[in-house]
């Protein structure tokens, strides 16, 4: 019996004092209160009606958009990160009679060679086939030749143009002068609302002239 009593005393959990228990409770309640205060303080506040509806839908700037595209012919756009805003401006150009060529700046290579010249492409091989080289027609000239007579022109929409160098952006800004029926829209970055600028200004062509 005595040995059993000793084992029970060893297995029994340690006892906390009343002061220690009170401290733990107070600390726990303090943490809960601070968390609730932080949650209440962090909130999204809408300052105007544009925050509820969307700044893109509030601004009636479609007329200015079409006018700038026809005047400058090469535009750099900055769309919000969530995307979807540029579709409204794209559809309005499509309603004007433009056809689109969507290309990505990543993996484009030399824009002048890809868009205006016959450019080579080496297909992947497994080591047993001979190394081949295929040639593709120029992207812009090929699609200009395939446009219907009722088309107003071709819009080259460049995705992720922020990775292009200044010289490549300068070529895109000069492309409408080489092909009069071509308009260039380059996505050069992101902003809180949909804004655009002449691509020649972004590529520093205006300063050089």
Swiss-Prot record:
Q: Write out the similarity annotation.
A: Belongs to the NDH complex subunit N family.
Q: What happens when the gene is disrupted?
A: Malfunction of the NDH complex.
Instruction: Please give the Gene Ontology molecular function terms for this protein.
Output: oxidoreductase activity, acting on NAD(P)H, quinone or similar compound as acceptor; quinone binding
Q: Which UniProt keywords apply?
A: Chloroplast, Membrane, NAD, NADP, Plastid, Plastoquinone, Quinone, Thylakoid, Transit peptide, Translocase, Transport
Q: What is the lineage of its organism?
A: Eukaryota, Viridiplantae, Streptophyta, Embryophyta, Tracheophyta
Which gene is this protein's source?
ndhN
Report which reactions are catalysed by this protein. Answer: a plastoquinone + NADH + (n+1) H(+)(in) = a plastoquinol + NAD(+) + n H(+)(out); a plastoquinone + NADPH + (n+1) H(+)(in) = a plastoquinol + NADP(+) + n H(+)(out)
Kindly state the subunit structure of this protein.
Answer: Part of the chloroplast NDH complex, composed of a mixture of chloroplast and nucleus encoded subunits. Component of the NDH subcomplex A, at least composed of ndhH, ndhI, ndhJ, ndhK, ndhL, ndhM, ndhN and ndhO.
Please give the name of this protein: NAD(P)H-quinone oxidoreductase subunit N, chloroplastic
């Amino acid at each position: 019996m005595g040995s059993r009593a000793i084992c029970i005393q060893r297995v029994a959990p340690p006892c906390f004092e009343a002061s220690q228990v009170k401290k733990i409770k107070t600390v726990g309640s303090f943490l809960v209160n601070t968390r609730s205060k932080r949650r209440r303080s962090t909130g999204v506040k809408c300052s105007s009606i544009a925050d509820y509806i969307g700044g893109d839908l509030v601004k009636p700037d479609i007329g200015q958009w079409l006018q700038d595209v026809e005047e400058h012919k090469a535009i750099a756009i900055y769309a919000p990160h969530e995307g979807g805003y540029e579709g409204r401006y794209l559809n309005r150009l499509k309603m004007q009679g433009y056809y689109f060529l969507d290309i990505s700046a990543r993996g484009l290579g030399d824009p002048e060679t890809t868009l205006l010249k016959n450019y080579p492409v080496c297909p992947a091989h497994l080591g047993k086939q001979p190394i081949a080289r295929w040639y593709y027609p120029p992207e812009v000239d090929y699609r200009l030749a395939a446009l219907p007579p009722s088309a107003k022109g071709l819009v080259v929409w460049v995705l992720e143009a922020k990775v292009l160098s200044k010289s490549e952006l300068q070529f895109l800004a000069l492309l409408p002068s080489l092909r009069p029926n071509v308009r260039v829209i380059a996505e050069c970055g992101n902003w809180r609302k949909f804004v655009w600028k002449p691509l020649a200004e972004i590529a520093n062509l205006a300063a050089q002239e």
